[in-house]
Design a protein with these regions (language model features):
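Conserved N-terminal phosphate-binding loop of PLP-dependent enzymes in the Aspartate aminotransferase
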Residues: 1-212
Length: 212
């Protein structure tokens, strides 16, 4: 469609970044967009924004100048070079995908064992699960976070996989996840699914929603 109507194809790689493939998600699916945008994941958290693109598109920016608070700062560039070298040398994206699949498998296995209805989605290194109980979903996710916190995990339905997430840590997460889902199973079947009275704080709410 973009070619048909002569519209530049832009990939927002700010969230996906390098998690799926070296160089970005567009490398994984073998599409060369007109523009791809990356953020500080490229520099492992240091201030940096990256815009890459085809020559005929990028050359239009040569006559413009946009000031920035960090435009003279070199730390971000040095960090990015180091990160890219480390990422490629250690095949980080492959490891993130493997760890993410392990998390998805835990969710699927435990939820099936305790008959708790969830929906699993997201890319492997960015896995997401949501409860499937309609109006109870927010209460259940709040309870899940509350109980996981007691076991040492600041957890939610989304999981941003990191290289530092060791197999030992994932196993520990699995045990905690099962403990909490066993409680959820009990509440659903013996407490009429009433989670709100068990919460120590208010039910989670979405103050900001990404329109993308």
């Amino acid at each position: 469609l973009t070619k048909k109507f002569n519209i530049p194809l832009i990939f927002d790689e700010i969230t996906v970044g390098w998690r799926v493939a070296n160089g970005g998600f567009h490398k994984k699916i073998k599409i060369n967009p007109d523009i791809a945008v990356f953020s500080k994941a490229t520099s492992n958290g240091f201030p940096l924004g990256t815009i890459i693109g085809k020559k005929n598109i990028m050359k239009t920016a040569q006559n413009s100048f946009i000031s920035s608070a960090y435009w003279t700062e070199n730390i971000g560039f040095v960090a990015a070079i180091s990160m890219i070298k480390f990422f490629i040398k250690n095949n980080v994206s492959k490891k993130l995908i493997h760890k993410g699949r392990s998390i998805k498998k835990i969710w699927k296995t435990v939820s099936k064992k305790y008959e708790v209805k969830i929906k699993i989605s997201g890319l492997d290194p960015l896995p997401v699960f949501n409860f499937n109980y309609h109006e109870k979903n927010d209460e259940m996710m709040t309870y899940f976070t509350q109980e996981m916190l007691k076991l040492g995990f600041l957890a939610h339905g989304s999981c941003f996989i990191m290289l530092s997430h060791s197999n030992k840590l994932i196993k520990k997460y699995e045990k905690a996840f099962e403990v909490v889902f066993k409680k959820i199973f009990y509440i659903l079947n013996n407490k009429k699914g009433k989670f709100k009275p068990l919460l120590k704080g208010r039910v989670k709410f979405a103050k900001f929603k990404n329109p993308v």
